[in-house]
From Swiss-Prot:
Binding-site residues for Zn(2+) 2, renumbered to this chain: C135, C138, C160, C163
Bias type Basic and acidic residues, positions: 494-504, 1282-1291
GO molecular function: enzyme binding; histone H3K4 methyltransferase activity; methylated histone binding; transcription coactivator activity; zinc ion binding
Start-end of Low complexity biased regions: 884-908, 1184-1197, 1294-1312, 1348-1363, 1506-1518
Species of the source: Mus musculus
A family per Pfam: SET
Protein name, UniProt field: Inactive histone-lysine N-methyltransferase 2E
GO biological process, one term: positive regulation of DNA-templated transcription
Length: 1868
């Protein structure tokens, strides 16, 4: 008992404890844990099968069990759990519990022999009505009244109806007890009522002030003892029969029922908590005057001045009476009734008589609530008043007040509160409203919404009023508590906020229970021990667990509160109610302990995580029911094992987990049923798990790491899946909700849930350290983005800890994720096999993302291993390092796609990855990983690789994948990205894909590298910075080195920087990886787009994310991502973004690896630095966190890669020329990202949503085998969607697509830089083929990709596309292309174009590279590498470059083609087929590009474009020719020109179906341009060199030259021009002209910003782009850096708030993110915007690109200028990248934008404003070149003129949708 007492937090803690404990201490311990564990599973606590909900083994929420049926075995279902569960299950509401328990409740008797008291009555209620009798035979408690026993003559020996069968009136019993329950609030039956109230109260108190509860717990024990004694006495009195009322035996846990009594006067009511109430009654400072908070004084004075003293006159008179208290003696006297003091009239009072002034501390209600006081909690003496001109105030008389505080609330009040203003201060007086006879209690109406109160609200009418709404509500709530546990839980969440007030009061009460709480804690700690098992169960339900925690906390608070009342009640009926109360207290204690445990879990996760996880696994393995009981026992047994502190921590984490245990189980089941997409619900958990895994991986040796990597991707994907469609409402949704809630609450609920962990790791650095320690938090995307909320929310420690333990046991020490468990469970052997088989492992790497969770992935022949691989991405990556070191064909298969030649457009796998089927579309919708195939970008992500493989291989059914993707959502997208390429390789293109894998993989790895950037962005950034800056050569070497070389460095990097190595894991194998790596900032991005493009599938996945945000961003990397890439216009920018996305979003898994490499602390530090410096590390986190962030990352990806490299470079690389732009951009972006990241956190959901939207489209791409069919379907859908969305896009849907295309394009540009050659070669054939076959197929695929994306992206495209298919394509391209085929293809095309450009100007480019190489090397060693790779690419082209570049290549190719077709691309986009073709082509036809880098590609593009947009193609071609000719840089320019032309031409072509492709193409085109751009970006990253050479060489050279400086500027530029336009600087020099084009693509531009930024935004903003204004805003916001927000042109309005951009850069970014997220649909249209995004999002790289594109658009206008502009854009892209990260991050986080704001502000003001203007113009915004130019600064204007001309043309041609949509993206 003593223990029970300590345990009991409430006054009735003893009862509670007893009840919870049952009769076994073990049980007690277990119950506390259980109670603590699950928010709404007290029943579960009672039993695994606790009737109420799912059986949560370790459901700590015993309270829920109150409502739930207690388990047969006491230990299994401790009553406390039930008690606590009341809130959720009506723990405290005895009626609820009774109903729930069906009259079987376990409660412990007070006496030492209080075994488990089971309440089983014929009435079916388990509440203690105060008169209960115990059967002498079976010891079951029954209501005396129900059993027909005369209370006056209780038999000495009593047998229940079962032991002594007899006829009983059940109906009468039910009615009687129901009535009692309703009246319980009175106090007699308050046990039940209080049960209701208490849990909530307890919950609130606990949640709100877990600490305070803890503190208060100490006081409670004594109080509890006293209460118990009193209760015992009361109970004796109550029961004439000892049996009926075993004073000691049955403490009525329900005693808390009295709490409701208290509640009635919750504001000023006297709670029946004897101790507390008495203390309050006796201990309050008599107030002779009021105390006013500043807020109240200020508001009152303001109102008084405004209103004069209208109320004063009458109030003054009254107040005069009242004021002179000496003269006025209140005609009332306080009486103690039921332990409550009430105010009775001392004489007969007439109506309107002044009774008394209500004195106390006046404060605004917000202040009161902010302090945690809220009406939801029955605080005794708080009066709420809102009649003073609507001023919500309250008077807190709890510690300072007068007798008026004792006035209770009643449904039939006889007095009211009136205010008077005296001497400028407000006074509240109680006036009678009717005649009040002497001795009548004075009551006032409820001044708070008792209906929302969790606790039982006590009404002073004392049931005199049969219609009492309060009692009705109470009874309803009681019943609802049982039936509406879920609702309650949700409500609990809300109530948590409101409960905070109660919490404070509860805290007061908890003080009493403090000792008890502490005591309870020890048992709880024990239970915490049990927790490991529960943890495993709860792994899947971490979000829920958090919810549960939150709710539980309130419940605990309520319990606490009630316990006081219960004590009073106990005096009357100490037996069962007391016990119940004790149980509640215990539950409360458990909650507290759980919180503690959670805190400890954070600490312990690193150390004990592995241990706990395995246990979790075991427990999970155990049957649910079995597990519940077993776990309880096991935990009990284990308790001793774990240190108490650890236990507490464990308990905390476990409690959290426990909450999820049931949920996790459910989720697992759901996952199994839903093809393991449960992570969606366990999103956060997955994230946590991923983080955990990542940490674990970091801790784990390389192989383990690999395994972890493999696992992580899956977990990560789910995390990304925050916005997956499948489990939108589940974890992700809840988590998002919770996150926002937490943000709103600023950690109040969060405090309870994650606060402790946060407390433990509130400091990002500390958190980082802890996270590092904690495998779960390994990758910091989430932790970073929303370190506090996400981390605690995700409780990566908990979830991942659990998961890791589980996984680790199954696969490896590291693989403990729930998703892993799922995957393991679902495909344990397969995964393991794969895991073990090297080949499979390689595959596995790609598979990891999806495979873990989805048999789908496993369904892939290689998928299984691959599925595991993502988990083992690292291992894969290691294998890749070892086996695929160079460019091993097998595993890299996904990347094999890059082997354009090998993989023909017809290659099903190849085609398939590009567009997952409709199924995949579903994925995309649900998971948006539809781009999964595109996810190759995610290759960087361990999981990505796995996913990629899945996607790539037909075996990985789109459906399966879709499920997986849906389940894994964003995380999966990365995985899918990886998988796509891998799958391709797995399919028929193993060898081919291998190359592609290398290319793709490399990109992916690169992405991973970058991704690690997000996760380890800081690290990667540092490393990359180091690599870029310190080790330009090394980076170059790394990048240039074959994938394996890169992989090694990458691996090391990955290991060191989780991301890089991991990223490479998937694709590092191929030399391209080096390119990717060196492009990590720029190249990585480039490669990523390439590989993604190449893979098409991989890109798609990425695109999914990119489409979403990340998807878009990644999209540029992925096929769809390619759009983003292209859009990024910064292959590097977008590629980076993609990479970043991959790293952060797509490559979340990668991120984890990177995280592992870098301590969380360091990572955080880096991220922080990145944020500060504007690098995109944070964005990575963001992206990881959210698709949009991913999009942000996209730009960040570009930027992130850039940010990582560039961002980190930005940090370090600020000095690096290219990186500097990126760095500047990154810095800006990072800064923005920081904000972005954090914003990303919140935005993440939106982005996720976006992702979901886009994912669906992407999903189609995922369909490997039916790529063409899917593409066809998708394409058509894309067209339809594009049309719709385009229209909508204008409304903001298209932006996504636009973004995507832009993004795709952007990366291709960047990629193009590096990848173009590869792509050129790869793309040429592919493009050709695609042109021929893929045109339909690619187009189709693109369309498909586009389509799904178009859902998000395409719609806008279509919206744009009404007039022009292009938009569809852009949208599609963005969505679809990004998705996969298109995206991939586009990426390829773009890359190809880029490649063409590169190839065409390989030498120029090389020269640029060479000349800029130093800069690049410095800036972007990777970029230099990328360029080198580009140079090499031609050589490597077939292999890695092709792969890497392949996607971009197509992009590039397309762009070159697009150069001419760029407009065509837009045009082509408009005419889906051609672009699609190209897009498709790029996938397989990467070779196509390669061959005709400049011309053929253009032709291909042209053909492609020509097919749909011959005419435009021609002009563009001509232009393209010129521009193209102009390129190296010109290629970009050419591409841009073409693209611009295309865009311009697009106007005409828009109608053509090719739009999707076109869109895609456009994205690609931008890619080409962007490739150039990317090259620029590369220049930035990679194009620094490029800038120098091609840029300079190109007409764009000038621009690009500017870019070079710009580049330097980009990164630097950011810094330098950063202020102006981060991008502008880059663009300024070079971009100016390009910006204008982006303006034309305005939306796209903006989208590009969006794309980048939204490419995340592109995706999100892309649509916005369609919205253009919005998009623009987004773009601008996102990419407003990019003044190219030109996208603002479309989105200008959106973006319009250039100030927004500037100011709102972050804001916008946030908005952007949100918009992007929100606008994801719009973003699709922004595929055109993607360019904008590229420009803007390209981040100014993207924007630049977009802008560039406009220049390109006006290639003729400013061939050189435009081209230079393009380069600037690339620069800008890079910048964008930097900025991109910003924009992208912007969407993701404000960070990039922030940086952008730096540049962006200038850019924004300039760009946004300008762009807004342009945006206003529509795409004229493109012309906004001025705007863009502004963003781009110098070039912007230049561009402005050309672009305007051209843009106008563009506008004219593409105008409708295309221009907006397309232009930004499509044509951008």
């Amino acid at each position: 008992m003593s223990i029970a007492i300590p345990l009991g937090v409430d006054t009735t803690e003893t009862s509670y404890l007893e009840m919870a404990a049952g009769s076994e201490p073990e049980s007690v311990e277990a119950s506390p844990v259980v109670v603590e564990k699950s928010n709404s599973f007290p029943h579960q606590l009672y039993t695994s099968s606790s009737h109420h909900s799912h059986s949560y083994i370790g459901l700590p929420y015993a309270d829920h069990n109150y409502g739930a049926r207690p388990p047969p075995t006491p230990p299994a279902s401790p009553p406390p759990s039930g008690l606590i569960s009341k809130n959720e299950v009506g723990i405290f509401t005895t009626p609820n519990f009774d109903e729930t328990s069906s009259a079987t409740t376990i409660s412990t008797s007070e006496d030492g022999s209080y075994g488990t008291d089971v309440t089983r009555c014929i009435c079916g209620f388990t509440h203690d009505d105060g008169y209960m009798i115990c059967c002498d035979k079976c010891s079951v408690w029954q209501h005396i009244d129900c059993m027909g026993i005369d209370r006056q003559h209780i038999p000495d020996t009593y047998l229940c109806e079962r032991c002594q069968p007899r006829s009983l009136d059940k109906e009468r019993a039910v009615l009687l007890q129901r009535r009692k329950r309703e009246n319980m609030s009175d106090g007699d039956t308050s046990a039940t009522e209080s049960g209701d109230e208490v849990p909530v109260e307890l919950y609130t108190a606990f949640q709100h002030t877990p600490t305070s509860i803890t503190l208060t717990a100490s006081r409670v024990p004594k109080v509890t003892d006293k209460r118990r004694k009193k209760s015992g006495e009361k109970e004796q009195n109550f029961s004439k029969c000892k049996k009926a009322f075993r004073e000691g035996s049955r403490k009525s846990s329900r005693v808390k029922g009295s709490a409701p009594e208290i509640d009635p006067s919750s504001d000023s009511s006297n709670f029946v908590w004897e101790t507390k109430i008495k203390a309050w009654m006796d201990r309050y400072e008599e107030a002779n005057n009021n105390q006013y908070s500043e807020g109240v004084q200020r508001e009152a004075q303001r109102l008084a001045q405004r209103l004069g003293s209208g109320n004063d006159s009458k109030d003054m008179n009254k107040s005069e009476l009242s004021t002179n208290n000496s003269l006025f003696r209140p005609p009332v006297e306080s009486h103690i009734q039921k332990n409550k003091k009430i105010l009775k009239s001392a004489k007969d009072l007439p109506p309107d008589a002044l009774i008394i002034e209500y004195r106390g501390k006046f404060m605004l209600r917000e202040q009161f609530e902010a302090n945690g006081y809220f009406f939801k909690r029955p605080y005794p003496f708080v009066l709420f008043y809102s009649k003073f001109h609507g001023l919500e105030m309250c008077v807190d008389a709890r510690t300072f007040g007068n007798e008026a505080r004792f006035i209770r609330r009643s449904c039939t009040p006889n007095a009211e509160v009136r205010h008077e203003i005296e001497e400028g201060t407000i006074h509240l007086y109680i006036y009678s409203i009717q005649s009040i006879p002497k001795g009548t209690e004075i009551t006032i109406a409820f001044d708070f919404d008792y209906g929302n109160c969790k606790y039982k609200v006590d009404c002073a009418c004392l049931k005199e009023n049969p219609e009492c709404p309060v009692l009705k509500r109470s009874s309803e709530s009681t019943e609802n508590i049982n039936s509406g546990y879920e609702t309650r839980r949700k409500k609990g969440k809300k109530e948590k906020d409101t409960s905070k007030e109660k919490d404070i009061q509860n805290q007061n009460m908890t003080l009493d229970c403090e000792g008890t709480n502490n005591k309870i804690r020890s048992p709880e700690t024990k239970q915490r021990k049990l927790s490991p098992l529960r943890l495993s169960v709860s792994n899947n339900q971490e979000p829920d667990f958090i919810d549960d925690m939150e709710e539980k906390t309130p419940i605990s608070n309520e319990v606490e509160m009630e316990s006081e009342e219960q004590i009073a009640e106990r005096k009357r009926k100490m037996t069962r109610e007391e016990r119940k109360m004790e149980a509640i207290l215990q539950a409360f204690a458990r909650l507290e302990k759980r919180e503690k445990r959670r805190e400890q879990a954070l600490e312990r996760i690193s150390t004990a995580k592995t241990e706990v996880k395995p246990e979790c696994k075991e427990s999970q393995v155990i049957a649910d029911a079995e597990v519940v009981q077993e776990q309880v026992k096991e935990e009990t047994a284990i308790k001793p094992a774990a240190a108490k502190v650890n236990r507490t921590k464990q308990r905390k984490s476990f409690s959290r987990s426990r909450t999820h245990i049931g949920q996790q189980r459910r989720r697992h089941r759901t996952v199994s049923m839903c093809s393991d997409i449960p992570p969606s619900s366990p999103d956060i958990e997955v994230l946590s798990q991923q983080n955990e895994i990542e940490n674990t991986v970091l801790a784990i040796e390389p192989e383990t790491e690999t395994a972890v990597a493999e696992i992580i991707p899956e977990a990560e994907v789910p995390a990304l899946n925050k916005c997956p469609t499948k489990y939108p409402k589940t974890k992700k949704h809840l988590v998002n909700e919770w996150l926002s809630e937490k943000n709103e609450k600023t950690g109040k609920p969060s405090d309870s849930l994650s606060e402790r962990p946060l407390r433990i790791t509130t400091d990002p650095e500390v958190l980082a350290t802890q996270l590092n320690s904690l495998p779960g938090l390994t990758y910091s995307p989430h932790v970073y983005s929303t370190p506090k909320h996400y981390i605690r929310f995700t409780s990566p420690f908990l979830s991942e800890k659990k998961r890791r333990k589980e996984t680790t046991e199954n696969i490896s020490g590291s693989c403990k994720k729930r998703w892993l468990k799922q995957a393991l469970e679902e495909e344990n052997s397969t995964i393991l096999h794969r895991y073990h088989s090297p080949c499979q492992e390689r595959s596995r790497s790609p598979t990891v993302n999806g495979e873990n969770k989805s048999p789908l992935l496993l369904s892939d022949s290689c998928s299984l291993p691959d599925l595991t691989t993502p988990l083992k991405k690292r291992r894969l990556y290691q294998l890749l390092d070892t086996a695929y070191s160079e460019s091993s064909t097998p595993t890299p298969s996904p990347y094999a796609t890059p082997t354009h030649t090998d993989i023909t457009p017809t290659d099903p796998a190849f085609a398939t990855p590009p567009r997952i089927k409709s199924d995949d579309e579903t994925y995309r919708n649900g998971y948006k990983p539809i781009y999964s195939p595109v996810t190759p970008v995610t290759p960087g992500t361990p999981g990505n690789t796995m996913h990629f493989e899945n996607i790539s291989s037909p075996e990985s059914s789109p459906e399966i994948k879709r499920c997986t993707y849906n389940q894994e959502g964003y995380d999966r997208p990365s995985n899918m990205l990886t998988l796509g390429p891998f799958r391709n390789s797995n399919l028929t293109e193993l060898g081919l894909q291998e190359i592609k894998t290398i290319g793709y993989t490399s990109p992916r790895s690169r992405t991973e590298v970058n991704r690690p950037c997000p996760g380890e962005k800081e690290s990667v950034s540092d490393l990359q910075l180091g690599l870029d800056a310190v080790e330009p050569a090394a980076l170059q070497k790394s990048m240039e080195t074959p994938a394996h070389d890169r992989t090694e460095p990458s691996n090391q990097l990955d290991s060191t920087h989780s991301g890089r190595g991991t990223m490479y894991s998937s694709w590092v194998k191929s030399p391209d990886r080096t390119g990717v790596n060196f492009s990590v900032n720029s190249n990585l991005r480039d490669l990523t787009p390439s590989h993604q493009l190449e893979t098409g599938g991989g890109f798609r996945v990425s695109e999914s994310k990119c489409l979403i945000q990340q998807d878009d961003t990644r999209g540029m990397f992925l096929g769809a991502a390619v759009f983003c890439t292209s859009e990024d216009g910064l292959a590097s920018g977008f590629g980076r973004t993609v990479n970043d996305n991959l790293i952060d979003g797509s490559c979340t898994p990668q991120n984890p690896p990177q995280k592992k490499k870098v301590s969380l602390l360091e990572y955080r530090k880096r991220q922080r630095e990145a944020r500060k410096s504007g690098s995109k590390p944070e964005n990575f986190a963001l992206i990881s966190v959210s698709p949009h962030p991913s999009g942000s990352l996209s730009s960040s990806g570009d930027g992130c890669v850039h940010s990582s490299e560039n961002g980190e470079q930005a940090e370090n690389q600020a000095s690096l020329p290219l990186p500097p732009p990126a760095a500047a951009a990154a810095a800006t972006a990072a800064a923005a990202y920081s904000a972005s990241s954090e914003e990303g956190s919140s935005n993440c959901p939106v982005k996720d949503a976006n992702s979901s939207e886009k994912k669906d489209p992407e999903v189609q791409w995922t369909a490997s085998t039916s790529v063409e069919q899917v593409r066809e379907r998708s394409y058509q859908r894309a067209l339809l969607l594009s049309d719709h969305r385009k229209d909508k896009d204008s409304g903001g849907e298209s932006p996504c697509v636009s973004c995507s295309p832009s993004h795709v394009q952007s990366p291709p540009s960047s990629h193009s830089n590096h990848i173009p050659q590869v792509h050129a070669q790869s793309l040429a054939p592919s493009l050709s083929e695609l042109m021929a076959d893929p045109d339909a197929e690619g187009t189709e695929a693109t369309s498909t990709s586009e389509c799904p994306s178009p859902d998000t992206s395409q719609s806008p495209s279509k919206t744009s596309k009404p007039g022009s298919p292009g938009p569809i394509n852009p949208a599609q391209s963005h969505g679809k292309i990004l998705t996969k085929p298109d995206s991939h293809w586009e990426a390829t095309a773009t890359v190809s174009e880029a490649d063409n450009s590169v190839h065409q100007n390989p030498e120029p480019q090389h020269r640029q590279l060479s000349s800029n190489t130093p800069a690049l090397s410095q800036n972007h060693a990777p970029q230099a590498h990328a360029l080198s790779a580009n140079d090499q690419l031609p050589q490597k082209l077939p292999s890695a470059p092709t792969k890497l570049h392949c996607p971009p290549s197509p992009h590039t190719e397309n762009p070159p083609k697009s150069s001419t077709p760029h407009t065509p691309v837009q045009h082509g986009y408009l005419s889906p087929k051609p672009p699609s073709q190209h897009l498709g082509s790029p996938f397989r036809p990467h070779h196509s590009q390669s061959p005709q880098v400049g011309t053929p590609q253009r032709e291909t593009q042209r053909n492609f474009y020509a097919a749909a947009q011959n005419l435009q193609a021609n002009p563009q071609q001509a232009t393209s020719g010129a521009l193209f000719t102009q390129t190296p840089s010109g290629q970009s320019s050419a591409t841009y020109s073409q693209f611009n032309q295309q865009s311009l031409n697009s106007t005409a072509p828009p109608p053509p179906p090719p739009p999707p492709p076109s869109s895609y193409y456009q994205n690609q085109q931008p890619s080409a341009n962007f490739q150039n751009y990317n090259q620029l970006k590369g220049s930035l990253s990679q194009q620094t060199v490029f800038t120098s050479g091609p840029n300079q060489a190109l007409p764009g050279s000038t621009s690009q030259q500017s870019v070079p400086g710009h580049h330097v500027t980009p990164g630097h530029f950011l810094p330098s021009q950063n202020p102006t336009i981060h991008h502008q600087p880059a663009a300024a020099a070079v971009v100016p002209p390009p910006p204008p084009p982006p303006p034309a693509p305005g939306p796209h531009l903006i989208q590009q910003p969006s794309s980048h930024q939204q490419h995340s935004v592109a995706h999100g903003v892309g649509p916005v782009h369609a919205v253009t204004p919005g998009s623009h805003i987004h773009s601008q916001t996102a990419g407003h850096h990019l003044p190219p927000p030109p996208p603002p042109p479309g989105p200008a309005p959106h973006h319009h708030p250039p100030p927004h951009p500037t100011t709102g850069l972050q804001s916008l970014q946030a908005q952007h993110q949100h918009v992007v997220n929100s606008a994801p649909p719009p973003p699709p249209p922004p595929p055109p915007p993607p360019p904008a995004s590229v420009l803007v999002s390209g981040h100014h790289s993207a924007s630049g690109q977009a802008l560039h594109h406009p220049p390109h658009q006006g290639p003729p206008l400013f061939p050189a200028s435009a081209h230079p502009a393009v380069p600037p854009y690339p620069s800008q892209a890079t910048h964008h990248t930097t900025l991109g990260p910003g924009p992208q991050h912007q969407p993701s986080g404000t960070g990039p934008h922030c940086p952008l704001p730096v540049a962006g502000p200038h850019l924004q003001p300039q760009g946004p404003n300008s762009i807004p203007t342009p945006t206003a113009s529509g795409f004229c915004p493109h012309p906004h070149p001025g705007s863009v130019a502004l963003p781009h600064g110098v070039q912007g204007p230049q561009q402005a003129s050309p672009v305007p001309a051209q843009i106008p043309i563009h506008r004219a041609q593409v105008p409708p949708t295309f221009q907006n949509n397309y232009h930004g993206s499509g044509w951008h």
